[in-house]
Amino acid sequence: MLPSSICSMGQIPRTSPHYYGMLPKQMSKGHPPMVTRAVGGVEKGEVGGNVRSLQVMHSKELQAKIRKQLQRVELSPSLYDTAWVAMVPERSSSQAPCYPQCIEWILQNQHDDGSWGINSSSLSVNKDILLSTLACVVALKKWNAGSYHIKRGLNFVGRNFSVAMDVQNIAPVGFNVTFSGLITLASGMGLQLPVWQTDIDEIFHLRKIELERDSGGTISARKAFMAYVAEGFGSLQDWDQVMAYQRKNGSLFNSPSTTAAAAIHTFNDRTLNYLDSLTNKFGGPVPAMYPQNIYSQLCTVDALERTGISQKFAREIRDILDTTYRSWLHNEEEVMLDIPTCAMAFRLLRTHGYDITSDEMAHFSEQSSFDDSIHGYLNDTKTLLELFKTSQIRFSCEDLVLENIGTWSAKLLKQQLLSNKLSTSAQSEVEYVLKFPLHSTLDRLEHRRNIEQFKVEGSKVLKSGYCGSHSNEEILALAVDYFHSSQSVYQQELKYFESWVKQCRLDELKFARVMPLIVHFSSAATIFAPELADARMVLSQTCMLITVYDDFFDCPEISREEKENYIALIEKWDNHAEIGFCSKNVEIVFYAVYNTYKQIGEKAALKQNRSIMDQLVEDLVSSAKAMMVEADWTATKYIPATMEEYMSNAEVSGAFASFVCPPLYFLGLKLSEEDVKSHEYTQLLKLTNVIGRLQNDSQTYRKEILAGKVNSVLLRALTDSGNTSPESIEAAKEIVNRDAESSMVEMRSLVFSEGGPIPRPCKDRFWEMCKIVFYFYSEDDAYRTPKETMSSARAVILDPLRLIPPPSCPETLSS
């Protein structure tokens, strides 16, 4: 049978008073007192200083800072790009700078050690700082400005020149080309670097190796890369070829440095117009990429969702996605030309209900779209991961665009794993994403994993270093605080839930799987908002009860008389005294179900202004009768003649209606009787039943066949092949898996599409239940792998977070 309970092994000590229903009133309002097992939300000594200090900041202050970043993007200045813009001469005279404000800003922003760039006490000298410093020196020398600054800058480069030759040091994209190009420019201006000629020769040797190396991508990708780092080639570059990459806004790749170099060599009016707009907007400094508002904001939205705090910024997120949607509809280059931006925009827009089709992703349908790009030349793992995740948001099994993207991106990611060239963190991320599809992950587990691996990233690297989202430290601090406060709520709920189990005498049932921690884990992992305590407890209680009476009907030691007695009692409901109990087991199971569902119905009536009791009882009766049919099939060794006969009963015996639907009435939304009878609601429930049954069957068929039970895998093998040979069983399993996946695609379309009478939060509950099924039944029956399941339960409810200290960021530019 389908274990409708999503639970496993192990219990924790029972404490607290006894209650029969849901949460007592005092637990439904606000957060309960802290519980010491997760005090602080993190283990001592695990959090960096900045985040630790932010944790004591009031939640509202953190939210205000994040909200400001969502409303107005702040970009960090790039000294490298600013230096190149500073080198552009006046339109009418090559003897004067076109952008003197950039020169002035460079003069005012040299560090005490003579360097320029993203530099702080927490960062050692790196190639980006070396590159930015030499670029600023060359820019100043070109206009004979700041001789003292130039001297200090040259001394810094000389002292740290070995960094440029260190192949283990993280390098900006194309560093060997751009750095050697600056050395050539400096030499042509009469500047002498205080380094040995052999060291300079080594830099040009590294440049030669980079230009000759067999990198990823194709000839087209190589041309695009060479154009992207065109400033490193100077007059040796074919600038007419480079200008083929000019965008509508006049830039090349939205890169100020590449565009500035093109302006110097071609005097193209559109490049100068782009640089004019850039300097008019930012003044002296310029960012490493512009525009990147949409990408930056989408990254922030994604970070908020991945860490579980997006609901606090619903209005701001909607504004950002509305803007992105308009850009998408107008086919704007900022979104459509950049692979990761386009992929992330599609994923977020689609999951938030915007009406977009995968047709706009068709230009990425073939692997050549990646191979021919700069991302392909660099074999960019992050871009491939974004494409692979996006490919999973299919609304139709016939969507060949997303299917193709998923196929080739997965293939390239697997090749990267085999190459052993990925960093430890990148390898871990790729392995995880490939192993666990989006529909087999649980929200709160994902939040924890993402919080613990969250990279505040003091700087990122393109051709030069720059800071990503400047709200990342606040995001992490708020996420840690929210996760901690949520855990304290879950822990109080668990204490109450354990006392409820004991009060119901469920622990006296020898045949039943009674595991409060695991059951409540599945509830907290999906209905995770602390304020939804009632909905969470209803799910835990109903899930536990359905598990118990699933075991009741599944247990060979329970007689047919007892099973019939239970069904008769449920049918009589309030008049059950007319029937009586034929055993202690029946009495315990019935009263646990009766008392709990009775209270759920009464509380739901207060929230919905209508009675739902008849529906609750009807669902309980239907599932009990369907379980009885399965028990009879097993006892008589009956095999249904068709899959239709099997599924018509199996969909009901899963009893999903009895534990997925009751929590819907406690989400703070009204669900009318008409809503519950609507086609959309019926389809959501039907798909949940089908997915639950098929996914369970595909993973538990071995032991069910041995136990003489009917299973869709067995039935499919008999129907298609007429036998149960290992080959037939494997073929049947593949078909069942495919059917489950197909139903999941249909479910995704229903949940993520706007329209229909069912509110999105209610539709999400069906989606989350299907994810629970895939999570617990992805590799054999989860009830038989207690260690991993218990670890996951502890991670959500009990164990403190473990964080990695972050670096810091420099000042910002408002966009």
From Swiss-Prot:
Function of the protein: Involved in the biosynthesis of oryzalexin A-F phytoalexins. Catalyzes the conversion of ent-copalyl diphosphate to the phytoalexin precursor ent-sandaracopimaradiene.
Binding site for Mg(2+) 1: 550, 554
Residues holding Mg(2+) 3: 696, 700, 704
GO CC annotations on file: chloroplast
Record keywords, A-Z: Chloroplast, Lyase, Magnesium, Metal-binding, Plant defense, Plastid, Transit peptide
The protein, known as: Ent-sandaracopimara-8(14),15-diene synthase, chloroplastic
Record-listed Mg(2+) 2 binding positions: 550, 554
Locus of motif DDXXD motif: 550-554
Enzyme Commission numbers on file: 4.2.3.29, 4.2.3.99
Enzyme class per UniProt: lyase
Protein localization: Plastid, Chloroplast
Disulphide linkage map: none
Single annotated GO MF: ent-sandaracopimaradiene synthase activity
Any one of the GO BP annotations: diterpenoid biosynthetic process
Notes on the domains: The Asp-Asp-Xaa-Xaa-Asp/Glu (DDXXD/E) motif is important for the catalytic activity, presumably through binding to Mg(2+).
Remaining remarks: ent-sandaracopimaradiene is a precursor of the phytoalexins oryzalexins A-F. Phytoalexins are diterpenoid secondary metabolites involved in the defense mechanism of the plant and produced in response to attack (by a pathogen, elicitor or UV irradiation).
